Regions:
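Conserved RecA-like helicase motor core of SF1/SF2 enzymes
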Residues: 253-254, 263-296, 300
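C-terminal accessory/interaction regions of large nucleic acid-associated machines
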Residues: 414-572, 577, 581
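Conserved interdomain linker/interface between the two RecA-like ATPase lobes of SF2 helicase motors
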Residues: 77, 87-173
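Conserved segment of the helicase C-terminal RecA-like domain
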Residues: 296-321
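Conserved C-terminal RecA-like helicase domain
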Residues: 1, 155-157, 163-255, 283-288
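Conserved helix/coil segment N-terminal to the catalytic DExD/H
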Residues: 6, 10, 14-26
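Single conserved hydrophobic/aromatic residue that forms the stacking wall/gate
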Residues: 2-9, 13, 570-580
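SF2 helicase catalytic motif II
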Residues: 23-56
């Protein structure tokens, strides 16, 4: 079994395993790629709980874990967690090339490269690496313009000059910046340069056709790719993303401009990585993510060294601001500052303990409230507390089901969860103990079984659904309405219009189900998007509507089928119960 950081893939694997004992009984080796991806992000907490589940089955099969990471400073914690020993760690410092790191400083007139290299044989400072040039005046233009004249143009110019060492990857923090920098890079390409030639014509044709089908003839995805400028962001639909990533592996583009969706998902052969920013959607990226992306430099397999640069715009800033930003960049460039891999489940428990304390609730009382499902008494923001518990509840129920062949005993928890990552790392904190972690888990499982019942058949039904418990229960409550809608459709003529109406009516019923409303991005054109999507209209037509890309790629391609599958499972169980009666 090979797991990597693709959210949908991990969820699909988890759901398949929970509902298939034959697969579970065969697992002997689990390989976790990008194993450092643990923490407080929702999907990371869910993944951590999944690994806790896997441990049960792998141990029962006499199997092993192999965790891989290039940025893991506390490997011993994870070794103890997955192998019951801190000694099962193998470290290798080999790289396919040397590493050179530095700051790409733009002062409004020139780009200076300030390298952090300790190698005395090479210059640690390349002044005026790029100098701005006057641009010819256009008719009736009075103001003199230069190139580069802003940070994006400076980054594009630097990447263009560094292309002679091999492909360059430019990391950007938000989706719209991908094309913004691509447009500036396009200006750097000289008319006399040879046309970019694709080595694998089949891959190029597949990508081009997918783009035209999805975005239309004039899409910028194709326009830039023709020039060796490969762009990648989270807006890519899978029909385009897959051939694009295949194309990236087979070609040597001039430049790749991407958000972190590419940096952690695809192994790239690039010589240089330039960070246009150290922020992602307004928040600082972690030092762990920084080095995971930076580690792509020097993988073109023809490099003596991989170059890593962080862009720094010092125009119109005072000295204090400039120095503060330089220190921040230097902190990222220091590998000893890489973030530890930490248990998101432990942080969740600490957070709820803190929330309770702020509301004057002692930990013992918090435990009682969790066991009795009196969540509304913990904090006024009931939905937020429930959302946090939803991240771990189905995983806890799955483990409780596996450890209880008969009955509803909690005796297994002490021996099992003393080997959990949350318990192991509790020793590093003063505000939580390992025993409190165990008490929390026992109380939460009591609350879960009180909420869903103590019948194993119910546990197994909820666990195999793969969605959070609260959402599963909400769907079950709406089952009679869904049955009525389906029955009306069954006696209809089953035309395309009636099928579209069927989906619309079901969506209206489940609109307030947690997992539906959490993921759904509304649009004034939702009816038109739904109709065109189900009618097989070209994606290039659909994407013209508001939020169409997210609605199709996230909602109709992933989330909605997931919810419908759970609804079908409940319907089937309902039919079985009805026949038994």
């Amino acid at each position: 079994l090979h797991l990597c950081d693709r959210r949908q893939r991990v969820m699909c694997i988890r759901d398949s395993f929970r509902s298939n004992e034959d697969i579970l009984s065969c697992i002997k080796l689990v390989i976790i790629d990008e194993g450092h991806l643990l923490g407080t992000d929702k999907r990371l907490i869910v993944n951590e709980m999944f690994y806790e589940e896997l441990k049960y089955h792998v141990k029962a099969n006499g199997g092993r874990f192999l965790l891989l990471s290039a940025v893991l400073p506390n490997a011993e914690d994870l070794s103890e967690w997955l192998t019951d020993s801190t000694d099962n760690v193998y470290k290798e410092n080999w790289r396919p090339s040397d590493e050179r790191i530095g700051i790409m400083e733009w002062n409004g007139v020139s780009v200076n490269l300030n390298w952090k290299s300790t190698d005395a044989e090479r210059n640690s400072f390349n002044p005026n690496f790029i100098m701005r040039q006057k641009l010819p005046k256009k008719p009736k233009e009075r103001i003199m313009h230069y190139f580069p004249e802003n940070k994006n143009q400076a980054i594009a110019s630097t990447a263009y000059k560094l292309r002679k060492f091999g492909p360059v990857l430019i990391f950007v923090g938000i989706k719209k910046s991908v094309f913004a920098i691509a447009r500036e890079y396009e200006k750097c390409i000289q008319p006399e340069e040879q046309k970019f030639r694709f080595r694998n014509k089949a891959n190029w044709r597949a990508f081009k056709l997918a783009c035209i089908e999805s975005y239309g003839e004039d899409t910028e995805w194709v326009k830039f790719a023709k020039q060796g400028i490969f762009c990648h962001n989270a807006d890519l639909i899978s029909d385009v993303r897959i051939p694009l990533e295949r194309l990236m592996r087979s070609e040597k583009p001039r430049v790749i401009i991407a958000t972190s969706t590419l940096g952690q998902g695809v192994n790239l052969g690039v010589s240089t990585v330039i960070f246009s920013t150290l922020y992602q959607s307004g928040n600082p990226i972690t030092k762990r993510d920084f080095w995971n992306i930076a580690g792509r430099a020097g993988r073109a397999f023809v490099d003596h060294e991989g170059k890593i640069l962080v862009a720094h715009d010092i125009t119109k800033k005072d000295e204090n601001k400039i120095n503060w930003e330089r220190k921040m960049i230097s902190a990222y460039l220091n590998k000893s500052n890489i973030d530890r891999a930490e248990s998101g489940c432990l942080e969740l428990i600490r957070t709820l303990k803190t929330v309770a304390q702020l509301n004057g609730i002692a930990f013992d009382n918090l435990i009682n409230l969790l066991a009795e499902n009196r969540i509304n008494e913990i904090d006024e923001s009931l939905d937020e507390v429930n959302d946090l518990l939803d991240l771990i509840d189905d995983g806890l129920l799955s483990l409780h089901n596996s450890n209880n062949f008969e009955g509803n005993t909690l005796e297994w928890i002490d021996s099992y969860f003393t080997k959990s990552l949350a318990y192991i790392q509790a020793q590093y904190y003063e505000d939580i103990t390992g025993d409190e972690v165990l008490d929390f888990i026992k109380a939460r499982i009591k609350g879960i079984t009180k909420k869903v019942g103590i019948e194993k058949s119910i546990w197994e039904s909820i666990v195999s659904s793969g969605i959070p418990i609260n959402s599963d229960l909400q769907i079950d409550e709406k089952l009679s309405e869904i049955i009525s809608i389906v029955q009306s459709y069954i006696v209809s003529d089953k035309t395309l219009e009636e099928r579209i109406s069927l989906l619309e009516n079901i969506e209206d019923v489940i609109r307030d189900v947690n997992i539906y409303k959490e993921k759904f991005e509304d649009s004034v054109d939702i009816k038109e998007i739904r109709k065109k999507w189900l009618s097989g209209i070209s994606m290039s037509d659909i994407v013209q509507h508001e939020n169409a890309v997210n609605i199709v790629t996230q909602h109709y391609s992933f989330n909605m089928p997931w919810v419908l599958t759970v609804s079908y499972t409940h319907l089937r169980a309902h039919e079985t119960r009805r026949h038994l009666v």
